[in-house]
């Protein structure tokens, strides 16, 4: 694997703690696709975990906009 995003929820501070890792040989196009796929998976999680269908749909719409602008 060339990249990983790891997130933890800090209940006390109500903030996300993150570790973003990627290899030096990961190309920028690969990173763009990785971001796009990560955002899409977050929309799925939003819908499945807490039933936010409309917001998940809005996030998917943004993902399509994101891909139109970034993934050419």
Each language-model region and where it sits:
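Short, charged/polar N-terminal "headpieces" of proteins
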Residues: 1-6
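A short, charged
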Residues: 8-30
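C-terminal charged interaction modules
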Residues: 44-72
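Charged/polar low-complexity intrinsically disordered segments, enriched in acidic residues
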Residues: 24-48
């Amino acid at each position: 694997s060339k990249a990983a995003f790891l997130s933890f929820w800090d209940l006390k501070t109500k903030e996300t703690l993150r570790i973003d890792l990627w290899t030096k040989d990961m190309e920028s196009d690969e990173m763009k696709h990785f971001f796009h796929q990560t955002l899409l998976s977050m929309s799925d999680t939003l819908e499945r975990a807490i039933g936010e269908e409309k917001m998940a749909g809005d996030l998917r719409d943004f993902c399509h906009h994101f891909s139109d602008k970034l993934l050419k």
